[in-house]
Curated annotation (Swiss-Prot):
It comes from Xanthomonas phage phiLf (Bacteriophage phi-Lf). The keyword DNA-binding applies. The keyword DNA-binding applies. This is DNA-Binding protein G5P. Keywords: DNA replication, DNA-binding. InterPro entries: NA-bd_OB-fold, Phage_M13_G5P_DNA-bd.
Length: 98
């Protein structure tokens, strides 16, 4: 599944401490799944506290991001990880004229 990151900007959502629980902070980045013949599907991808944001470019979803649900179906795990799409870089390079 191909994903595009258009900005390395990170949004932080915070929830204050309450009922004896510490404050919670979520770091998120906007991405989009590219669907052939259809519009891109935007979604947010959670980042770990010390994780640098993904740079602008094309990625694929790491298969380690998938897991089985309790019915044996396939679903995304808690954290989606991206791997740089090296084929996108090759397709963007101009052909050499020789």
């Amino acid at each position: 599944m191909k994903v595009q990151i258009m900005s390395s900007a990170v949004a932080v959502r915070s929830f204050p401490a309450r009922e004896g629980k510490p404050a919670t902070h979520f770091r998120e980045q906007t991405a989009a799944v590219l669907r052939e013949g259809d519009f891109p599907l935007p979604f947010t991808i959670g980042l770990d506290e010390d994780q640098p944001p993904y740079g602008e470019g094309f990625y694929i979803i790491d298969p380690k991001s998938l897991q089985n649900n309790k019915f044996g179906g396939l679903e995304f795990g808690r954290r989606i990880r991206l791997i740089p799409d090296l084929t996108a870089k090759l397709q963007q390079q101009p052909a050499k004229v020789g």
